[in-house]
Amino acid sequence: MAGISIFEVGPRDGIQNLKHEVKTADKIELVRLLEDAGLTDIEVTSFVHPKRVPNMADAEGVFTAVRMNTSNTVKHSVLVPNKRGIDRAKAVGATNFNIFFSPNSDFNHEN
């Protein structure tokens, strides 16, 4: 029988479109609580344009803090929309990237 894998995206997807600001420390604490709950595959943040998604403007700080305060048994990934996002993520040590695209070229160009 095959196992079940949980890929948690809440620290990114659950926060990115909120209208109110979520503090960096709260994002880091959320990831820690998810790790404490036993999750081992967590999408931590998104390296998108900070003006388009203000709640992800602190992506570097969130990822760096999470990476420094966790065990090596947890896989942390990040969402990146383009090469600039990948470059920003790599600069803080990210190695697991989730990339999105759309069949709509206008959407891809805008994002």
Residue ranges and their predicted role:
Residues F7-I28, N72-K83, N108-N111:
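Active-site mouth loops of central-metabolism enzymes
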Residues F7-V9, T95-S105:
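Non-cysteine beta-strand/loop elements that form the S-adenosyl-L-methionine
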Residues G14, L34, A89, F97:
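Conserved, mostly hydrophobic/aromatic
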Residues N82-G93:
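Catalytic cores of alpha/beta
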Residues T40-V66, F100-N111:
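Glycine-rich, proline-tolerant flexible connector loops at the mouths of alpha/beta enzymes
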Residues A2-E8, K27-V44, K51-A57:
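N-terminal glycine-rich anion-binding loops that anchor highly charged ligand groups
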Residues E35, F63-T70:
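Surface-exposed amphipathic alpha-helices with a cationic face
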Residues A2-I4, G38-T40, T70-H76, G93-T95:
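Short, well-ordered coil/turn segments that N-cap beta-strands
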